[in-house]
UniProtKB/Swiss-Prot annotation:
<dbReference type="InterPro" id="IPR012292">
    <property type="entry name" value="Globin/Proto"/>
</dbReference>
<keyword id="KW-0561">Oxygen transport</keyword>
<comment type="subunit">
    <text>Heterotetramer of two alpha chains and two beta chains.</text>
</comment>
<dbReference type="InterPro" id="IPR050056">
    <property type="entry name" value="Hemoglobin_oxygen_transport"/>
</dbReference>
<dbReference type="InterPro" id="IPR000971">
    <property type="entry name" value="Globin"/>
</dbReference>
<dbReference type="GO" id="GO:0072562">
    <property type="term" value="C:blood microparticle"/>
</dbReference>
<dbReference type="GO" id="GO:0004601">
    <property type="term" value="F:peroxidase activity"/>
</dbReference>
<comment type="function">
    <text>Involved in oxygen transport from the lung to the various peripheral tissues. Has antimicrobial activity against B.subtilis ATCC 6633. Has antioxidant activity.</text>
</comment>
<dbReference type="InterPro" id="IPR009050">
    <property type="entry name" value="Globin-like_sf"/>
</dbReference>
<feature type="binding site" description="proximal binding residue">
    <location>
        <position position="92"/>
    </location>
    <ligand>
        <name>heme b</name>
    </ligand>
</feature>
<dbReference type="GO" id="GO:0046872">
    <property type="term" value="F:metal ion binding"/>
</dbReference>
<dbReference type="Pfam" id="PF00042">
    <property type="entry name" value="Globin"/>
</dbReference>
<keyword id="KW-0479">Metal-binding</keyword>
<feature type="binding site" description="distal binding residue">
    <location>
        <position position="63"/>
    </location>
    <ligand>
        <name>heme b</name>
    </ligand>
</feature>
<dbReference type="GO" id="GO:0042744">
    <property type="term" value="P:hydrogen peroxide catabolic process"/>
</dbReference>
<dbReference type="GO" id="GO:0020037">
    <property type="term" value="F:heme binding"/>
</dbReference>
<keyword id="KW-0408">Iron</keyword>
């Protein structure tokens, strides 16, 4: 396994506390606000023209929840992340034509959101374990692109 028992424990302990809807919505909102050129993938979501519109956009919030719930599946499948994301990778590559760099960016934003919401839990070791996790998820999602 890429994760040792201690890392698995750290990842699981924090994940049980995560409010997936709230943190997921915030993570996707942050990506669209901080990297406005990424909005082109979400033009069918209605008004995403500025920070307030994005934060209050129900489709952005719902998709953010969906994205973070999917990330939560990686937490449950730490030993088979690549296999678990094979179909999503194919979908994002072939149907949505998403730049795989986005997966790394969103992973880093997920780290920021978790650190902001759970500062007592998000110590150095937890940060290292989650950084490893977001890297593996990003690599798994980019797998179909190679």
């Amino acid at each position: 396994s890429a994760f040792n028992p201690h890392e698995k424990q750290l990842i699981g302990d924090l994940w049980h506390k995560v409010d997936v809807a709230h943190c997921g919505g915030e993570a996707l909102s942050r990506m669209l606000i901080v990297y406005p050129w990424k909005r082109r993938y979400f033009e069918n979501f209605g008004d995403i023209s500025n920070a307030q519109a994005i934060i209050h956009n129900e489709k952005v919030q719902a998709h953010g929840k969906k994205v973070l719930a999917s990330f939560g599946e990686a937490v449950k499948h730490l030993d088979s992340i690549r296999a678990h994301f094979a179909n999503l990778s194919k979908l994002h590559c072939e149907k949505f034509h998403v730049d795989p760099e986005n997966f790394k960016l969103l992973g880093d934003i997920i780290i920021i959101v978790l650190a902001a919401h759970y500062p007592k839990d998000f110590g150095l070791e937890c940060h290292a374990a989650y950084q490893k996790l977001v890297r593996q998820v990003a690599a798994a999602l980019a797998a179909e692109y190679h």
